[in-house]
Amino acid sequence: MSKTYHFIGIKGSGMSALALMLHQMGYKVQGSDVEKYYFTQRGLEQAGIPILPFDEKNITEDVELIAGNAFREDNNVEIAYAIKNGYKFKRYHEFLGHFMNQFTSFGVAGAHGKTSTTGLLSHSMKNITDTSYLIGDGTGRGSANAQYFVFEADEYERHFMPYHPAYSIITNIDFDHPDYFTSIDDVFSAFDDYAKQVQKGLFVYGEDSNLRKITSNAPIYYYGFEENDDFMATDIIRTTTGSNFKVKHDGQIIGEFHVPAYGRHNILNATAVIANLYVAGFDMALVAEHLKTFSGVKRRFTEKIISDTVIIDDFAHHPTEIIATLDAARQKYPSKEIVAIFQPHTFTRTIALLDDFAEALNEADAVYLAQIYGSAREVDHGDVKVEDLAAKINKPAKVVTVENVSPLLDHDNAIYVFMGAGDIQLYERSFEELLASLQTHM
């Protein structure tokens, strides 16, 4: 394969995953990005994929250009050079929509839970049959012989509209991305348009009132916890090692399952995967076998222990996701104090969901807040401050800085849950260094 793909913005989570997948399929891959370290670049470096600085010299006749969605003529020299000199390029989602047509494709969409569900589906399928996949945590796997392709479908700016998958899961519909969507009706409209493009089977959460209204040309299967769902999770036992449950379909139990994951939402994610694979003709015994070994995806309830202290890192940046993450923490650590450290992501989302954020964070035993992380797409007009959120939480909520996370030490028998989509990991790293330094001075 002589073609070289050049990724403009290769460190983006979707872009890095796609680059890895194409590399593993035998294509030549390179990319450019800013110098700042991003967690996705480790996989790229391990694969030997060149990461170059942004430079118009990277744009040559012998490369096919794939551009990250955030990059435009006015903010990127490579895009500007390509447009000026007549080089064509595809956006990530445009390329993917065309590329996936050579496979039987399985999409995962939804306001929340996309990445975890895509991870669970791809893990199960790759252990049963040759499968390529793209996950939103920056993970990708490619095989030149794969018949199946699993991917995460992002609703932001309706990026999923070039996709026409054979099957798709939609985990839920919720109001998010207020910088783009105008209302919940606007969000619903986007998902409804996407659903109409699914070809063989659509799997949606049955207790979501919006998803009950969704329409598709493909058969629609509802999953959930209720008798009127086509696939119902039942006999649920939640323990400190995960969740056990059975799935009922057409009045029959189709299997008993265990997932080493926590929280009600992960039972739903697994039920969606089971329903999809059942309809697609996969052996339920094999599905059950491989669900047991799922180790999770990056930045979704990722745990580490530093100096005997449990630290959880999670991408949760919406009230619904915060509630789910704290529920998972309580399931695994029922006797521990749950300390939440949350960084709001974008000023527009913080303004739109301020009361909901406060209500969600009330589920923690103690709350700390980091300064709002503004998106590159917006300007801080001073309309909201993190102190506004702190004032609405029904317990003292202190604001911490990267330079001083020592207030977190005021807890015994606690686990620390760091949540956010910005640079909350800097706060987490600072806390880890503080714990390590205390250990060395004991």
From Swiss-Prot:
Which residues does the record give as ATP binding sites?
G110, A111, H112, G113, K114, T115, S116
Q: Which organism is it from?
A: Streptococcus thermophilus (strain ATCC BAA-491 / LMD-9)
According to its UniProt entry, the function of this protein is described as: Cell wall formation.
Q: Which Gene Ontology cellular-component terms appear in the entry?
A: cytoplasm
Q: Where in the cell is it found?
A: Cytoplasm
GN (gene name) = murC
Q: Which GO terms describe its biological process?
A: cell division; cell wall organization; peptidoglycan biosynthetic process; regulation of cell shape
The primary location reported for this protein is cytoplasm
Q: Which UniProt keywords apply?
A: ATP-binding, Cell cycle, Cell division, Cell shape, Cell wall biogenesis/degradation, Cytoplasm, Ligase, Nucleotide-binding, Peptidoglycan synthesis
Might you give the EC number(s) for this enzyme? 6.3.2.8
State one molecular function term (GO): UDP-N-acetylmuramate-L-alanine ligase activity
Using the record for this protein, list the coiled-coil segments as residue ranges, or answer none. none
Catalytic activity, per the record?
A: UDP-N-acetyl-alpha-D-muramate + L-alanine + ATP = UDP-N-acetyl-alpha-D-muramoyl-L-alanine + ADP + phosphate + H(+)
Indicate what this protein is called per its UniProt record. Answer: UDP-N-acetylmuramate--L-alanine ligase
The disulfide bonds in this chain are none
* SUPFAM superfamilies, sorted: MurCD N-terminal domain, MurD-like peptide ligases, catalytic domain, MurD-like peptide ligases, peptide-binding domain
Q: In which pathway does it act?
A: Cell wall biogenesis; peptidoglycan biosynthesis
> Its family?
Belongs to the MurCDEF family.
